[in-house]
């Protein structure tokens, strides 16, 4: 969704930098396919070691390519280092917009990243700042039960998984065999802290909203603030392979 959105809102030439492991490869492939299909150009794709303390050589290659955007998919702990070096090398002042997959700005780790994360745009299925009453209650519950922890995508995924199991077994009358359970949850829908959720009756994949988010400071803390919604999204990687 990040690729679609950015292609429609000004970005024409984007370099990708991803961690060199399977999820990074998938993210790179999906972004390139979607962005180029929308008319954009990806002149350079870089893969960095999964545990990489120095992004300077890669960022220099990014600068040399003169893109108007940099898409990153790097685990949150490493992402903070990359973003700091992005700012230290002045790329934030060079006209290169930093964008990425949502888990690089993990809600629970976001404040540790500091101001280098400000302005980063991401696309993801959850933000702790989602304004629904259900999410506000969820965020407060997680905070109270976990010594101040902020709810994140791991937490909401666990919540939805438990909800699905509970409702599935309730619908089967206690039967837990595979056929009964799968039959019960096909097409199921519910209101999650992340927003509306459902199970595709054909593929049994999750269908949910994807939110465009921007890191902003609110009341002294950093949050992924939603500014646009793409509703009822199916698995984007599978869709890109069709």
Language-model regions: role of each:
Residues 1-242:
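Extracytosolic ligand-binding ectodomains
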